[in-house]
Amino acid sequence: MNSTFVQIPKLNINKQVKKKTDSITANTLLPKLMNDTSIQQPNQQQQQQQPQQPQQVTNGITILQNYQPQQPQPATTTTQQLNSANNTPTLVSTKKSVIGINEIPEHLLIRDIIYVFQGIDGTYIKYNKQSDSFKIDENTSNTLVNGEPAYISKPKRDLVYRLCEFGWLFKKVRLFITNNDFKKTGLTNQSFCSAINDELIELYRIIAILETQVYKKFDMVNYGGGGGGSGGSGSGSGLESPSSVSSGGTTTSTEIPFIDGDSLTLIRLFVWIQSPLKRLKVLGTCVDSITVDMKGGEILSKIDTLSKHGDQDIRILIHNIMFKICQPLFSMIRLWMFKGEINDPYQEFFIRQYESVQLEKTWKEKFAIVARLLPSFISLPLSKRILIIGKSINYMKQFCNNFKEDKNDRYYYYNQEDDDDDDEDHDDNDDDDENENQGEDDEIIERKLLIKESKIIKEKTKELNYINKEVLQEIIELVSRQSSERLLKIVLNRFKFMNHVKALKKYLLLGQGDFIQYLMDLIGEDLLKPTSQIQRHKLVGWMDTAIRNSNAQFEEQDIVNRLDIALLPERPGNIGWDIFSLDYHVDTPLNTILSPNDILRYKKIFHFMWGIKRVEYSLASIWRKIRSSTSLSILSPIGGDIHKSHLIMNEMVHFISNFQYYLMFEVLECSWKNLEKFIDQEATDLDQLIEAHHQYLQDICNKMFLSNSDSCYECFKKLLSIIIKFTLLQTKLINLSIAIQNEKNFNETHQAQVNKEFNSFRNHLNNLYQEYTTSFYKFQSEILKVKVNQDLNPISLQYMLDFNEYYEEKKDN
């Protein structure tokens, strides 16, 4: 018989005994084993109740696995017997402590820890809702090991609690992502839960690997390797049974897959989970930063903040999560920028659409940015550009039904569906560009360039995600320029925006002088009547006459048809001059750009300038009557007063003429020049065009003292009212001279009345002039106080009103 050395299985015996048994051969060990009376041999009755004990072959001789040399205080070995009734392992023995109770085996604690890692209660470790933590069950002391209470030592207990942190985090994260109230709030919420769940699946994989190691050890401890022998109840220990020994005294060598010193322990488990625990802590931080009522950009901003971390591993993990949860956002951005549509069932997109907005407010109020839903990695200026791109496309789709069919338009190619055949055709055409371009006109070449541009943009769009979010800036640069250019062309060429603004300047800002003068000549007398006697249809007829007899007849018919007469709300004591106003009708889609508020501002400016025109018209009428009157010669007794009235009238004409010059050139023309220059050279989108027009009106109002100085405006209105009173006084004097001239029986009584009228005229004239001079000086001082835009120097107006310092010297005297 050949003697061979094999490894003795690891037994829970004294080290000295182990060393001896490792160094002796089976030939010398067998007689000692057979003659050792200290070994308790099971009786025949016990052998029938228990499964056949496994045997081990050493040097060709079968050795009982349960062999233990007798010691003064023998230490029991740790094994587990399989309960044949319920097939569950039960504790058999543990290493006895000095206090007389048994310690729970470590591999059972490890098995519980694996459950805890998944947020599941174990046998000894359970979740405590009150303390919100996993704790060792208080009933653990009731566990019996060899009929004695079991316990967990303090070092192991501390280590178990440190390991339970993993399970507590896992449970918290899993509970959050399974919250349906959070998921139903938005697509971003669902993506967030999905991304976190993907990370949990990876942790499940790690837990499964650990669980495999645990149950491998658990099987080896309980079943000795778990293969199941041929005898007994099938619960073999993995060691070879006696029945496997051959009749010739030889046995087959069986490898025992018993876990040796490299087996899984609590300490090893604690070390191995540090990296997964680090990832789980990041997931826990993500969950803690989110509340149930958050959605869209609020979630993205919170998680994006966590990505700014010095630890590269954490930064990469957050980037991976952000990559997934940003997909709904970037899908909405793509749809918005290329289709002008918003598919946002949960109201989580940072651009909100308001369906109930009036049609004329479509551009300004239909779409707006919701600041709280704007992600932190998209700046406010960038979001405004995104808003303008989508608004432009939506506006064109709503008001320009056939713009997509224009194959010379870039937008036509942006919105073509991806078609492989078309792409192949385009690629084929691209290969022959050099040859074909020689015989093609500029339109076809431009169209091919547009196709190339659209393909470049589409390719960049496919790369758009959180990791490559810089691509969004490039896409915006390309798409914004093209869509804005297209919309500006539509507004300026198809809608003829500048033609309408010019028409407003001509008629509501009194730029068409011949038409305005002719109209005033026709309706001047009617406007002196009380408002109750003013008939609108009659005024409209006079306006049509003025159009036919002035250069307005050469205007486009569309513009002429938009002109109308509007009567302002009446006030007690008003006459026709006070309520008359020209009107300009603006319909859809032009009214989305020239809003009703803009038209109201035009009317406000018209009313102000119309009042100045009325004063000018009244002074001119008085001057004509005086020059044509032959009856004033009989007013020689008040010749000095009449001369004085002429001087006063000249001052008033000088004031009105210079102020009108200031309005027409310093205000209207300069503002118009700035508007034209901006639109031609600087405007890149419709918002800038609208803003430029608003600034144009604002500059006019500021320079006319309509919005920046109530005191100047009131002083000027008072000056106009004084001039109107003066013209009425002059008219009364002319009528008096005519009455005297027509009186055939002029007597002393008449002379007394005439003298009384002369004295009244003189007094009124002096009072009016004194009031006019006082108001004029006050107006001069007020305009010096006004600080308006840098392009307006109030000193220029003051210089025009007193260029020869006449009023300055008069004031000093």
Curated annotation (Swiss-Prot):
One GO term describing the cellular component: centrosome
Region listing for Disordered, in residue ranges: 69-88, 231-252, 414-439
GO biological process: cytoplasmic microtubule organization; meiotic cell cycle; microtubule nucleation; mitotic cell cycle; spindle assembly
Tree of life domain: Eukaryota
Alphabetic keyword roster: Cytoplasm, Cytoskeleton, Microtubule
Compartment(s): Cytoplasm, Cytoskeleton, Microtubule organizing center, Centrosome; Cytoplasm
PANTHER family: GAMMA TUBULIN COMPLEX PROTEIN (PTHR19302), GAMMA-TUBULIN COMPLEX COMPONENT 3 (PTHR19302:SF14)
Protein role: May be involved in microtubule nucleation.
Family stated for the protein in its record: Belongs to the TUBGCP family.
UniProt protein name: Spindle pole body component 98
Primary gene name: spc98
